[in-house]
């Protein structure tokens, strides 16, 4: 029989074989295996050669060289490298040395930050089970999971991690936690019968078990159908590796700007040579270098890197770990969040929330979050119920006892997460603890003497208890609606028993209540109770069968269980809406559960209609809630024709999540995806911002841009607010630095007209002065702008999706730069002509000839000081680009000293140029300037005029620009 599957083996993976739809016999035949003996050792060796090891490919560790390459392969760094090479070529070692330091600093900071973030485990490899229990040639073996092959016969028990995708052939109360794949908090109860249909979601393929899922209950035997990259985990891994990382708008704009600056720098150098009739003397070459350097913002990369690094530290304190610096920019542009439900919007823990008892006017509502063993009772109308009073009701007390005793969960410290067992049973036990009737208390008076475990056939579980008196046995039963079929009676509050045999009205009442609770997204359990004696059964307890205990029971009530929303989720969603961000929930849960949670956290209110055109047919759809099957059946054209994309997609698959993100991208939306499971990994990488939960899988973390260490959806809102703050501050210091460059270019371009006796242009600013202004004077205030606190309206305006260089920012750069350049040039002209000797002398670009160059050197000092004080004042201008500096909003008045780093950088920056002007040799030999006296008046007047021009320009902006201010 082994040989019969050889040919079929070659194409099983590629054909997308529907293993869940096949009988055990068909699967065995297709794989050439014996469902009792497994494959032989020889056959397994052949299959290993054919299919390869059961491991995931393409998951190499951190590569420092690739990280380093990313740091130096951006446009701005390329510009700095070109400038450095030219400086070395003309033997201007001071300037070249400064540029080397700047490039090295930028590279080191970026490398260290990204290397730390990327230094994570090889998550996908380590998710695989380290060993597997396999049957080969009829013998049991424990082998490495990487040696498992298609056709192998595996056995599972509680605690095992499934090593490969398998078709189940035997199960005994087998439940598997598939939350990492499906997102469902409730373990999947496994079966062996074939499941028809091609489009059955993973969560509904109950006769399959998948690689990296965990057995939480029972035992099973299965045939391996897929290994390695052919497993569902492997497909996800492949999707992750194939997803290309796109650069952000700011990256693209900065790179474009850098190459434009490089081209412009070469053009300016050409202009210098042309104006000087292509005289390549040292004086002219140095002027060309000065003009080329003037247009390059040497400090920009350093400031961006440092500000982002500070932002990373700040976000880490807020429980958001940034793995990729580009996420800081991406966050501010987010327009849509696609969120997983389990563990993200919800606690990821099953909790009893509703209890319905016959004869009561309303349900009991049970408060409390997660596994906390405290929680108040109230009616559905919100009226508080005293616990002790509720327990006086015999019916309710027995229902609580049933929750505690018909249970195998173990709770040590629920508040610390020390719980073991099936999530549903944990929820029931925690509920009993809330009523101060947990199993440890009840076991003091009642002994568990027999268990009839849950099975897929009976869909119920029963426990038999011996009371202290020993006169009778108590039977506690829980399960699905089938429990009602073995109930002959119902109990009232006083404990009296009433028959319900043939009472169709009562059965309909219970059925209606079950449906209502299910519509709320609850998993509904039926609880029942009975009293018997061994004598009445007619045989000793040790020989009892299930039917001996589970008959003629008394119906106690219904318990509703669900994965409750986090306390902060509703407010977080509301904050997102206020910030212009739409929240979508993509979950593996059923539609009713998904809709209930979405309503509770505020994602949707009531489903509203939408339509799509499909030829001549109008197909009605819900614009709020759809299943993955409904969504996937639509073509891309039909999806794009929807007025609104669904806010909730239930029974969601990994491919559906990616398709949803693609649909949002086609609508020019900027998407963040949150999640914690393996099933979220492809979409986390596909999204513009992938946000993983710290308690989630390593796969999700590896695929993400940001990891939330507190698993708190509210942290996402804080992270987006922080991203907006950082991006706003980047715009502020980009304006500050680039307007300085524009001013310098204006001074040096017009300065070409000032020629000495030999006809050589004399620069108003020397290359060292320019570097001093750009790095020493301009960079500290720019960094201070980078740590400006967020404005109060940062999360009350729509996302900024236009990128860094908006029309307004470009206009501001050139207008403020023109103000600075013209006023600085005016200082140059005033010192030389009206108040100087009007003589530009000779060789004042290269020598320190004080006898002839004194006026030129004094004029340069005046220009440098005017530049210095104007760009320092301009830092305050940049705090708010529309409000007057005289107002608190604009950074003046009460806010003038709020940014202490800015105050210090401005004060120190104003004093730093003074030594370069008055210290001998340093001033004349290095900076090509000298001390001034009366020229200080020109400096002060220049700054005052710049203030007036800035205020007038802002006044015009406030009057004529009506778009929202989001900086």
Curated annotation (Swiss-Prot):
TM region(s), chain numbering: 71-91, 93-113, 255-275, 284-304, 733-753, 813-833, 901-921, 932-952
One GO biological process term: sodium ion transport
Listed InterPro entries: ATPase_P-typ_cation-transptr_C, ATPase_P-typ_cation-transptr_N, ATPase_P-typ_cyto_dom_N, ATPase_P-typ_P_site, ATPase_P-typ_TM_dom_sf, ATPase_P-typ_transduc_dom_A_sf, HAD-like_sf, HAD_sf
Keyword field: ATP-binding, Cell membrane, Glycoprotein, Ion transport, Magnesium, Membrane, Metal-binding, Nucleotide-binding, Potassium, Potassium transport, Sodium, Sodium transport, Translocase, Transmembrane, Transmembrane helix, Transport
Cofactors required: Mg(2+)
EC number in record: 7.2.2.3
Primary location recorded for the protein, binned into one broad class: membrane
Cytoplasmic side: 1-70, 114-254, 305-732, 834-900, 953-967
Protein name: Sodium/potassium exporting P-type ATPase 1
